[in-house]
Structures are given as structure tokens and as C-alpha cells.
Amino acid sequence: MSSSITAPEGIINPPIDELLEATDSKYSLVIYAAKRARQINAYYSQLGEGLLEYVGPLVDTHVHEKPLSIALREINAGLLTSEAIEGPAQ
């Protein structure tokens, strides 16, 4: 019996090696993905209120998919860019 249910996307997919190509370090990747996941979570929270301050997911999502998994897939697809912010000159 075949099933049409696909394997869930998670922390192991996309692979970390591919994700690290988008950032300078693992630390940057974690911060980058966490900030985007917060934006996605806020977007879903605001849908019920009619406020659309944040941009929703840029990739197709599933009902039970977590915001962090969505953010990692967006980064892997090259839909987001990360820019370094320079500190104040001393």
C-alpha cells in the first residue's frame, strides 16, 4: 500500500552544509533563522487580527510545519539575504 504523505521537513532537511553557504558561521545562521522564524510566527498570530505587519512564508508550507523549519527552507532556497551590520567607528 503506497502513501501520498511525504516525509516531514525538519531540522535535518535542508542539510546544514547547504545552509552554511548562506552565512559566515553557524552562529550567524542560528540568529538569522531565529529572527525569520519569529517574523513567521508573528505573521500567523496577526492573521486572525487582520494585521499584516510581517511578511508571511515565502515557500509552500504544511499545516503542522514549524516556523523554524520554514525559515531554514527559505534560507536554503536563497529567498532571503543576510547582510552584516558594521558597528560604530571607534
Swiss-Prot record:
* Keyword Membrane in annotation: no
Catalyzed reactions:
RNA(n) + a ribonucleoside 5'-triphosphate = RNA(n+1) + diphosphate
- Tell whether Nucleotidyltransferase is among the UniProt keywords: yes
Alphabetized, the UniProt keywords read: DNA-directed RNA polymerase, Nucleotidyltransferase, Transcription, Transferase
Q: Name one Pfam family in it.
A: RNA_pol_Rpb6
Naming one, the record's GO cellular component terms include: DNA-directed RNA polymerase complex
Give the Gene Ontology MF terms in alphabetical order.
Answer: DNA binding; DNA-directed RNA polymerase activity
Cite a single GO BP annotation: DNA-templated transcription
User: According to the lineage, what is the superkingdom?
Assistant: Bacteria
Extract the InterPro entries matched here: DNA-dir_RNA_pol_omega (IPR003716), Pol_omega/Rpo6/RPB6 (IPR006110), RPB6/omega-like_sf (IPR036161)
What does the record give as EC number?
2.7.7.6
Subunit comment for this entry?
The RNAP catalytic core consists of 2 alpha, 1 beta, 1 beta' and 1 omega subunit. When a sigma factor is associated with the core the holoenzyme is formed, which can initiate transcription.
- Family, as annotated: Belongs to the RNA polymerase subunit omega family.
What's this protein's function? Answer: Promotes RNA polymerase assembly. Latches the N- and C-terminal regions of the beta' subunit thereby facilitating its interaction with the beta and alpha subunits. Required for kasugamycin production and aerial mycelium formation in S.kasugaensis and responsible for pleiotropy.
Q: What is this protein called?
A: DNA-directed RNA polymerase subunit omega
> What taxonomic lineage is listed for the species of origin?
Bacteria, Bacillati, Actinomycetota, Actinomycetes, Kitasatosporales
- Report the gene name: rpoZ
